[in-house]
């Protein structure tokens, strides 16, 4: 076998380029692991009643927005059934702060003398918490703007009630009660409003409270009330042990494949390209995961193993066809093998697509890595392997 000739082949060069890029991504960009491997907290939120598909979508969108507004964008959120929302929190995030945000339904009401002046649905613009002039001093709070309709409602309720308290409630809890100034009690619409949480400069607790109010007003109220059903903490030690066990299992699997292939074909050298192709496939899949910032979890690892298993099957099909037809018809035999491989790949992808499109959480992770592995196999690693086999058997 002419190795120097192989290294100049387009299919082999493509494989080498992808493996090199993948190694670069893995080393310098790193891999993200799900909480089942890196540790973290799982929170199960229970809805007070079954939710429709639109309510589930709106709930996840609102929770995601609230967390993003607070700089907590590494949290994974997905539904389970029609009455539960699962929240996965990495160990690097402030779990207590997230729990506080999750407890908010975000129902905002302003009352004067126990009469509703406006609600969260009347709020149209919300600004980030900032310092606000308050007489001769400064306060810290959340400025916001009412719609014209909301401002008119407030004007009607506030008219003639100077120095009465404007009680602001979030989820039934009083969060602020400023005194109504005379200029806001003149019966005219005043869209600009503010919720103060304390004096300026604020404490950390006041900053967190203001951000929670800001995110609740900005995202709107949840369509249904959610309660925390239970909280589960996952130790990172479990993930480390699993990854260690997976690495050992893959190593043993590669050794077993090498031995079985050597016995099956009575040619140990055939096992070498099969093993190199399998290892290359794993590296490219991991590089792809690093590129798209996909969090690798237990099902994702299972998907990688499944893809590698499929890869070994495909390589055996290519090898069998090449040996069966002989040197004179080796190209035709490999072409026939690829017909079988493409049909098998199409079946695998078709089986995974429903999980990818409709699946959430763990199911989606399995589908993504399996589909990625199959596509990487048929377009990158299998053609390279076939070229090696063609060169290896051309004299047979």
Swiss-Prot record:
Q: Which domain of life is it from?
A: Archaea
Instruction: Quote the InterPro entries the UniProt record gives.
Output: SecD/SecF_arch_bac, SecD/SecF_CS, SecD_1st, SecD_arc, SecD_SecF_C
Q: How does it sit in the membrane?
A: Multi-pass membrane protein
Kindly give the HAMAP family that the UniProt entry links to this protein.
Answer: SecD_A
Family per similarity comment: Belongs to the SecD/SecF family. SecD subfamily.
Quaternary structure and interacting proteins, as annotated? Part of the protein translocation apparatus. Forms a complex with SecF.
**Function as written in the Swiss-Prot or TrEMBL entry:** Involved in protein export.
Protein name (database record): Protein-export membrane protein SecD
Q: Which organism is it from?
A: Methanocaldococcus jannaschii (strain ATCC 43067 / DSM 2661 / JAL-1 / JCM 10045 / NBRC 100440) (Methanococcus jannaschii)
**Source taxonomy:** Archaea, Methanobacteriati, Methanobacteriota, Methanomada group, Methanococci
Encoding gene per record: secD
